[in-house]
Amino acid sequence: KWIISYGDQYTQTAYYICSVGNKVLLNPIGTVDWRGLAAQPYFLKDLMAKFGVKMQLVKVGKYKSAPEMYTEDKMSEPNREQVSAYINGIWDEMVKAVSESRKISTTELNRIADSGITFADSKEYLKTKMVDELVYTGDIKNRIKKQLGIKEDETINQLSVSEMLKAPAEENTADEKIAVYYAYGDIVDEVAAGFNNETCIVGSVVTKDLEELANDDDIKAVVLRVNSGGGSAYASEQMWNAVNELKKKKPVVVSMGGMAASGGYYMSCGANYIFAEPTTITGSIGIFGMIPDMSGLITDKLGVKFDEVKTN
């Protein structure tokens, strides 16, 4: 089937997706954002110091950079190294894919990104072959009708993405089924009061669910979709064990999303098979524990004093 991509403005991500179209069309006053990737972490150490707060940190692994925002005022060299490797890896994948779709060399695509084309005249996008034509929104339907071979006064049977998502899934009446289990978010031991477990991976809930899947004779295999940067080491350990127990009864396949790192990788590594995307952040680079030292705020700034009587 043919695909026509059209946009008034293409963000970099949108252009990456739409570049696979047979034709990429742009509004005559539209823009294409194509300028490379950047990472810009922020650091709270000096801000906390103004309030008399500092972090006590214990960590294993020089690349475990998550606590740096609380303990440093700039990126450590190991963190700079890994972030650079990551964003360059993603950019290389994007450039390679667009190069194949648009028949533009990777060297040229990098030159275009360096040129600041995002704010260029729209005709520049034609010249660089990033788009095929400049077309007003009102003309798109007629172009599609022409492509379909129908008259201009006839209507097109259209279906939006939101309408497609509302369509009911076909009922599976087969006796043998493959379960797809989604594990998205931060890994926690228990869901906090006032929050729901749809935005995090609750270790106790996941282990119970995996146990039920293991005991369901209609389920012949399980696909575990993981998208998590990690969290509780205890919960990760329990889920890893649950995956191993599940694997004893039926095949377990992990499909990794944008991230399956630290505890997200830990819970995955017990599976029979693991599949990741070229841009997935995965692996484990260490652990850390961190406790805020509030003495500078409470004692020095607020004047709160403590005394103690104890038995041991």
Each PLM stretch: what is its role?
Residues 254-256:
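RNase H-like polynucleotidyl transferase catalytic core
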Residues 1-114, 119, 145-250, 259-312:
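Small-residue-centered hinge/linker elements
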Residues 133, 141-147:
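Terminal amphipathic helices with adjacent charged low-complexity linkers/tails
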Residues 125:
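Short, contiguous alpha-helical
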